[in-house]
Amino acid sequence: MEIISTQKFILLTLATVAFLTPHGACLDELMKSSLESREDDDDKYYETKDSILEEKQRSLNFEEMKDWGSKNFMKVNTPTVNKVPNSVANLPLRFGRSNPEERSIKPSAYLPLRFGRAFGESLSRRAPNLSNRSGRSPLARSSIQSLLNLSQRFGKSVPISLSQGVQESEPGM
């Protein structure tokens, strides 16, 4: 390979610059002209679109809009709902019951209300089933006595038969 002299190198560089500069200027002009033409086209497009929209907006009348509203919408009536009384609404129909009226609203004997009226009734039903031996034992006597105290504390008097049963078991110890 030959070493290129500086004179030849400078000459080659100037020729390349001279050759590429006009083409670059042409490309710039072409680029500018295409961009400017696009901007002009865009402006024209938006101007025509705006003018069409303005014409459409000017041509609308309120009467036409009222006509459109009445034609396009259908009025739908809401279905009527059968109202169920409150006492029946919460009763499920299952376990072989056909009518909700079969279920009583009163609490059952084995499910007393919390601190309520069925507390003393459930005690009176269970107390006669105690044998005499259980009445004599101190454990049974203390449990019955605590039940009596509970019922009195919450404002419910225990039936007389239960209190008499406890009193009878005390003297015979």
Swiss-Prot record:
One of its GO terms (cellular component) is extracellular region. InterPro entries: FMRFamide-related/fGRP. The modification Phenylalanine amide is found at F95, F115, F154. One of its GO terms (biological process) is neuropeptide signaling pathway. Residues 1-26 form the signal peptide. Keywords: Amidation, Neuropeptide, Secreted, Signal. It is found in: Secreted. PANTHER family: PRO-FMRFAMIDE-RELATED NEUROPEPTIDE VF (PTHR14403:SF6), RFAMIDE PEPTIDE GONADOTROPIN INHIBITORY HORMONE (PTHR14403). Belongs to the FARP (FMRFamide related peptide) family. This is Gonadotropin inhibitory hormone peptides.
